[in-house]
């Protein structure tokens, strides 16, 4: 078999920042991460540590690293979210070539929601609403997570930042 796999990656700091913002936006919903008695998950840094070791993010990052270690990445087309937002047509042309299908010009200012998800199944992190216009969200991870937590994320995932050429 010769499977063709496409994986979009994103700066892990931005992913954890997004999760932290969802956590803060929903103080009335218990995502089972914070335990005041045990004093776990009560700080941003602790929550990032928990997310980095559990589903969905931690598991995915660990499996991605294992795939690369086993050299299974040779048949994968990787896109960085940040690059895709800057040059979507260029990336889509590569995608169409990868799948050996005829290119279709997309309208990045009129994106339609064609799928539906049961967001309630994902708790506070379930947000599968597609924006109608392709725009990169601002990099606010230093403000949301703090510099120390951002540095820890990079240090603990150096392979990720090197492999995908994040600075």
Q: What role is predicted for each listed range?
A:
Residues 23, 27-29, 51, 66-70, ...:
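PAPS-dependent sulfotransferases, especially Golgi type II membrane carbohydrate sulfotransferases
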Residues 10:
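Extended cationic-aromatic binding surfaces that line active-site or macromolecule-binding grooves
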Residues 1:
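Active-site periphery "cap/insert" segments of enzyme catalytic domains
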Residues 4-7, 77-79:
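Hydrophobic/aromatic beta-strand patches that form the interior of the parallel beta-sheet core
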Residues 13-98:
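PAPS-dependent sulfotransferase catalytic domain
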């Amino acid at each position: 078999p010769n499977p063709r796999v496409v994986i979009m990656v994103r700066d892990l700091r931005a992913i954890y920042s997004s999760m932290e913002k969802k956590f803060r936006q929903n103080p009335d919903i218990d995502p089972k991460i914070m335990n005041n008695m045990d004093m776990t998950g009560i700080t941003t840094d602790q929550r990032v540590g928990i997310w980095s070791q559990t589903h969905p993010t931690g598991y995915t990052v660990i499996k991605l690293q294992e795939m690369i270690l086993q050299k299974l990445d040779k048949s994968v087309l990787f896109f960085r979210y940040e690059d895709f937002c800057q040059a979507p047509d260029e990336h889509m042309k590569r995608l169409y070539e990868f799948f050996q299908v005829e290119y279709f010009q997309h309208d990045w200012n009129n994106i339609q929601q064609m799928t539906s998800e049961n967001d309630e199944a994902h708790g506070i992190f379930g947000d599968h609403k597609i924006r109608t216009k392709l725009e990169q969200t601002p990099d606010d991870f230093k403000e949301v997570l703090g510099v120390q937590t951002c540095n820890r994320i990079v240090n603990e995932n150096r392979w990720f930042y090197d492999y995908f050429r994040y600075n």
